[in-house]
């Protein structure tokens, strides 16, 4: 694969930031539902506290490490496309081949959690 230009990297970085926000929002919405369960009495405060702790030390930290600690923006975007947080047609034409290559080689049967 050709080396990406600065313009392509900038575009992929922007999509990566959008993907991180969308994916974190998705999981935070799931966490919010657990608050609703607590408010309705389906779980107690201790269970909710454990759920919050698990989210913070688990999914939230994993997303941070993946999106913020790494700088492989094309990989971030491929992950986001595979998991429907970014649509393939949102990717600039000049970057699509690179992202498609990653999708074909690294995200073949990766299910969305």
Placement of each model-derived feature along the sequence:
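Acidic, Ser/Pro/Thr-rich low-complexity regulatory regions
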Residues: 1-113
């Amino acid at each position: 694969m050709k080396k990406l230009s600065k313009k392509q990297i900038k575009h992929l970085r922007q999509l990566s930031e959008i993907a991180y926000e969308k994916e974190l929002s998705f999981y935070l919405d799931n966490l919010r539902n657990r608050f609703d369960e607590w408010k309705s009495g389906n779980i107690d405060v201790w269970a909710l506290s454990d759920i919050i702790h698990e989210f913070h030390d688990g999914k939230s930290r994993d997303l941070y490490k993946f999106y913020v600690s790494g700088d492989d923006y094309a990989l971030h975007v491929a992950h986001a496309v595979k998991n429907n947080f970014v649509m393939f047609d949102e990717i600039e034409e000049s970057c699509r081949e690179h992202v498609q290559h990653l999708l074909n080689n690294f995200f073949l049967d990766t299910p969305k959690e």
